[in-house]
Regions:
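A short, structured surface patch at a secondary-structure boundary
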Residues: 75-128
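Secretory targeting signals
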Residues: 1-3, 13-19
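Structured C-terminal subdomain patch of bacterial secreted/periplasmic proteins
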Residues: 270-351
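Bacterial lipoprotein signal-peptidase II cleavage site
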Residues: 24-39
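Proline-aspartate-enriched helix->loop->beta-strand connector
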Residues: 133-139, 157, 271-272
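N-terminal export leaders
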Residues: 5-9
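Extracytoplasmic substrate-binding proteins
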Residues: 58, 148-151, 155-221, 316-351
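Basic- and aromatic-lined ligand-binding clefts that recognize polyanionic substrates
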Residues: 67-82, 189-248
Length: 351
C-alpha cells in the first residue's frame, strides 16, 4: 500500500535532513512580525478579474495580490520569477535558514525580507497563515484537503488549490507556473518564462539522443523502496529529457504518485536502464542489496544525496528557476550512467 503523499514527503525530508535541522537549532523565523510587507509586480492589461479552476471548485481573484502565502511546497520560485516576494512559504526541506529562498532564486529576492516560514508536518498551519494577513493563498504543489480549503477560504481570501487533473503533488511544473502567472496577473510573462525553460530541456534532450527510449526510475529508500510515479515532477523531468519510465512503475496499479515495495525487491531494479536514487545510503540494507544488481555493477545509476546541498533540493523542486540550476549538474550524471561503458562511474554532483 502506498504511504499517504503528505506522510511520505514529510518522512523522506525528515529522514534526510535531520543533521541539517540539528545544526540549525531552534527556528526563530516563523513569526508574522518577521514577514515582509509583501510585494506587487506590474500586472498585465485586463488580467483581472481572473477565475481559476481547481480541485475544490473555482476561485476568482479580483485584483493584483500584494501579500501572497504559499501553502504548497514550491510555488515561491515562480512568484519570485515574476517579481513577487511572498510573505509566507511552506518549508519542505533543505537549509531552513534560507526560509524557502534557495540559491537559484536568491538574486531575485534582492533587498526584500525573506518570507515567513510555515511548517506542514501535520497539515497547513491555518493560524499562522491567518496571522500573515494574505490577500492570496496558493497551494498547487500540495495535498490541501477540502477541509483546509474551506477554512482558508473562510478567512475571506481567495485560495487556489491543486488541480483535480493530477495526483496530489503531481501538477506538472509548467502548468503550475502558468496558473501562478494567471493568479497574479502576469499570464504572458509566465508563458515566456515557461517557454524559455521548455527550450532548455529540449536542448538537453537533443544533445543527448542516448536518453531517448532509455528506461529510468527515481527511487528513494523509504520504508523499503519508494519508486516515484509518472505524475511526480522528478519522473516527469526524466521523460521530458527523453527517458521512458520503467514498467515496474508504469504497470503498477494506483502508481500516479508512486509505489512502495519491500527492500527485498531491490533486485527488481537491476534491469532498469538508469536508476536515480535519492539518498541511497540512508538505508544500508537497500544499499547492499542494490550493490548486487547489474544496474549497480554497470554504473547505470545516479545517487543524489543531502550532502549535495542545494542540488539535492533542486532535484525535487522542479520549478522554472530550479530546473536550469539542476540540469547543469544532472545531465552530466545521467549521460555518464547511460554511456554504455560499465567502467564509467557517474560524476559526483557539485553542491
Amino acid at each position: 500500500m502506498n504511504p499517504t503523499r503528505r506522510r511520505f514527503l514529510a518522512g523522506v525530508s525528515a529522514m534526510a535532513l535531520a543533521p541539517v535541522l540539528a545544526a540549525c537549532g531552534g527556528d526563530d523565523s516563523g513569526s508574522a512580525s518577521d514577514a515582509s510587507s509583501g510585494s506587487q509586480a506590474p500586472t498585465e492589461e485586463s488580467a483581472f478579474p481572473v477565475t481559476i479552476t481547481h480541485k475544490y471548485g473555482e476561485t476568482t481573484i479580483e485584483a493584483a495580490p500584494k501579500r501572497v502565502v504559499c501553502v504548497g511546497l514550491t510555488e515561491q520560485d515562480m512568484l519570485l520569477a515574476l517579481g513577487i516576494v511572498p510573505v509566507g512559504v511552506t518549508y519542505w526541506f533543505g537549509d531552513e535558514a534560507l526560509q524557502g529562498v534557495y540559491p537559484w532564486a536568491e538574486e531575485l529576492l534582492g533587498d526584500a525580507e525573506r518570507p515567513t516560514l510555515l511548517k506542514n508536518a501535520n497539515g497547513i498551519e491555518l493560524e499562522a497563515v491567518a496571522a500573515l494577513a494574505p490577500d492570496l493563498v496558493i497551494g498547487l504543489y500540495s495535498s490541501m484537503t477540502e477541509a483546509e480549503y474551506k477554512k482558508l477560504s473562510a478567512m475571506g481570501v481567495p485560495v487556489v488549490a491543486q488541480s483535480s487533473d493530477y495526483a496530489d503533488f503531481g501538477v506538472p511544473w509548467d502548468e503550475a507556473a502558468l496558473t501562478i502567472g494567471a493568479a497574479v496577473g502576469q499570464p504572458a510573462r509566465a508563458e515566456e518564462i515557461v517557454e524559455e525553460v521548455r527550450a532548455r530541456i529540449a536542448e538537453e534532450a537533443e544533445a543527448h539522443p542516448e536518453f531517448q527510449g532509455e528506461t529510468a526510475a527515481v527511487v528513494a529508500p523509504y520504508e523499503g523502496l519508494f519508486i516515484y510515479g509518472p505524475e511526480d515532477p522528478r519522473s516527469r523531468l526524466l521523460t521530458e529529457l527523453g527517458f521512458d519510465l520503467h514498467e515496474l512503475i508504469t504497470s503498477a496499479e494506483d502508481s500516479d504518485f508512486g509505489i512502495s515495495l519491500s527492500s527485498e525487491r531491490t533486485s527488481d531494479l537491476g534491469d532498469i536502464g538508469t536508476v536515480v536514487w535519492i539518498d541511497l545510503a540512508a538505508d544500508k540494507q537497500v544499499e547492499q542489496l542494490f550493490e548486487r544488481t547489474p544496474a549497480y555493477e554497470e554504473g547505470r545509476w545516479v545517487d543524489i544525496t543531502d550532502a549535495d546541498g542545494s542540488y539535492y533540493v533542486a532535484h525535487s523542486f522542479v520549478t522554472p528557476l530550479s530546473i536550469p540550476y539542476l540540469l547543469d549538474r544532472y545531465v552530466p550524471q545521467l549521460a555518464a550512467a547511460v554511456d554504455g561503458d560499465p567502467a564509467t562511474k557517474p560524476p559526483k554532483a557539485a553542491a
